[in-house]
Amino acid sequence: MMKKCILGLVAGLTLGANIAMAAENIYPISREMGSGTRGAFTEIFGIQKELKGKKIDATTTKAEVTNSTGVMMTTVANSKNAIGYISLGSLNDTVKAISVEGVMPSVENINNKSYKISRPFNVVIKKSNPLIEDFLAYSINAKAIIEKSGYIATKTKKFVSKKPKGKLVIAGSSSITPLMEKLVESYKSVNPNVVIEIQQSDSTTGVNVVVEGIADIGMVSREVKEAELKRGISVRVLAIDGLAIIVNKANPITNITKDSVYKIFTGEMTTWDQVK
């Protein structure tokens, strides 16, 4: 009898611990305003509200704001109850990606359209020149580099550089920056006559500095807005990227519904025991 009571007590304590953990507060982590990743995320999951006929971001003010992909991942990796979102190509083993509606984020699942949470990696320019055209032609058709980095290439034409001389300044999205760094390094091996500077910030800044003539190429990790196009820029798709929902590796959750993501990031769902 004593043994049964002890076992029952241990089981009860274990169950209680699990319930307590499951009911812990959710710690939503967001990207900053102006981030293309945030823009794509809020649009895909409908985390928006109407204001004077326009849809605006409705992310809860209780979410912690991070200013880059790297900071997002570090924050989630260091908090057991955190949940955030990143570029699929940036995913590493410091955090855990979870499935959405039962489908894991992967290049294969984006290609077969079972995982629908994806967005374009765009580049924008205002003024063109032979160096810009040569570099973009190389980058957009760099299928091996794009796919090895975890993204989906959209074009595969054969490229022969004309090796123009000059300097390029490329600025914008922190999500696109890691891929762009690889493309720049590879392009320099084909065309050693070029100097290329990359300035990491966010997608909106990427558009603004191109419009203002500060940068030659802007990196935009979301759809380019109609109002931005009216400022005289043109857009090209560099690659397709998935968005991954990430949690701490100690979190037992493996799947989440789109509705739960919406409710977490609008502040309607605040504890893990509510998550479906």
Residue ranges and their predicted role:
Residues 1-5:
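Positively charged n-region of N-terminal signal peptides that target proteins for export
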Residues 8-17:
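Bacterial N-terminal signal peptides
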Residues 21-276:
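Exported/periplasmic ABC-transporter solute-binding proteins
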